Structure formats: structure tokens, C-alpha cells
Amino acid sequence: MKKMFLFAACLAVLACSCSEKEEGTVKDVRASLKINANIGAPAVSRAEKTAWEAGDKLGLYVCNGTLGTPYNQNAVYTNTPFTYSAAGWTSEEILLDENEATVFAYYPYDATLTTPSALPVDITTQTDHLYGQGDTKASILNRNVNITMKHALSQVVFRMKKTEGYRQEGVLTGITLKNVGSATPLYTRATMDISTGSLTKTTAGNVEFSAGATLTDKAVSFSSIVVPVDATAGKDMQAVFTIDGKQLQFTFPAGTKWERSYRNIYDIVLGNNGLVIGGADGSGVTIEPWTDDVKGEIQLVPVI
């Protein structure tokens, strides 16, 4: 990579005017790209990315307009890592000339990525995949680019507590989202186009939450990042909760959808008659941009 930059620098030297040579000064007619990346739609959860930490890495593709055309037709501008520190974002120099470049970014950086239109996504790792594009074209005249990173996935959150009169311990040992019947709205693997955040679903499967706690009268949250779900045609998904050795389930209604960049929050109260999601006033099921929305009351029933 350094040899390629050196070769390019030599070409720039040859392009300088004779007057510059006579003065003993040679100017490089290019500048190095600088970025400022921020995360859009902040939220709070263990799985989602809300702020940068030292050592975080973005992958950048500097292109001639579209993702498949590297800047100046040079592969050196593909999948360049930018690393975050207290000083901001740094990388090896990405030199720009007068030609305008479109900058695409993704998180987290994958050194093995060769097809940026098909970045592998695996829900079992609970990685919050982000994508973004520079707000302006980059060139020697504009080398500072701002990038707002967006969430490509969705999130499901269950906020759970028990009533004071609940007669058992309230030991939660598992939460599973399941496909029902032949329909497969739930997927565990997909690929992402880093320029648009669009996902191609590849492997259907159930989603297991990391859940283990003894419920009290104070709500505690359990969350999972999920591949977005299009509006279901029927009752194609269930949530199964294992509490005090028993299974309680909820079948999501037709039309349920979980959109990318949103988190879907379900408030659950455990009582002697089972679990209740939501309330009689229509509260308790909230959708937030990770734009609040509220749905009606939902009941969970024991698995027979």
C-alpha cells in the first residue's frame, strides 16, 4: 500500500510546474481525507452501539460515486480501517486529488471483507451493525467529511417485573423468539450492503435471548438485536418465557413488524394468573428509534 502511495506521489511531483522546480520547492497537489463519524438515533441497551470507544474501527470505501467503483479506479481506496481515539479518527493517509469521491463507511471493521455489498451478519454474535455515507463529496478542496452511522438491524426488548402478590420466586431462565409453522419471519443470518444498509436474509432460525434473573417488583430489561421483520402475514412468531420451570408464550398478531433502526419494547408484568404484556389503556408496547408508537394489550398463555 505504501509503495502505491509513493508511486502516486511521484506522479504528482512530475506534474508540478518548472517554476516550482527552479525555486527548489515541490508541492503535492493532493490532501489526506479526514472524517468525523457519529451514531444516529441513540438508545440504551447492552447490545447496541451508542457512542464510540477507544479502539473502535470503521471500514471505509472511497469511491467514484458508487460502491463498486474505487476512487480513481485504485483498490487502495477500498476497506480502509479508521480507528477511534481521544484525538478522533485516524488511518493511513487516503490521498485525494481534484476528482470528487463518495465515502461509504461501516461498523465494525472486518479486515476479511471483499464484497462490501454483502457483509455477513450473524445475530448470534449480537453485533450492532452500522452503515453510513459521507454528507458531502470529498476531494482536495473538501477533505473533511461527516458521516452519520445508522443501525441496520432492529431490536426487541422485554421489560419484566412481578407483582408483589406473586406467590412463586419468579426465576426467569430463558426467552426465545420462535418461528411458527412453515412461515419464517425470524432470521439469524443475513448479508448487508454497506452503502444502503439493505439486508438479504439467508438463514431462518429462532432467536435466543441472554436471560437469567429473579424478577422483582422493579422492571429489568432483556434485549436482543434481530434481523428486521416485515409485516407478518399471519400469527407466524411466538415469544416463549421460561419462568419458575414453566413455559409461558405469546403469539404475535398478524401484521407484526420490526423495522431496522427501531427497538420494540414490551412491558411485562408477572402475576399469579400468568404474564400480561401492555395495559388496558393501550400502553406497554413501545416502538422507539434506536418515534414512539403504542399498541394494545397483549396476553401470554401457558404452553400446554
Locations of regions flagged by a protein language model:
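Sec-type signal peptide cleavage vicinity
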Residues: 2-11, 15-304
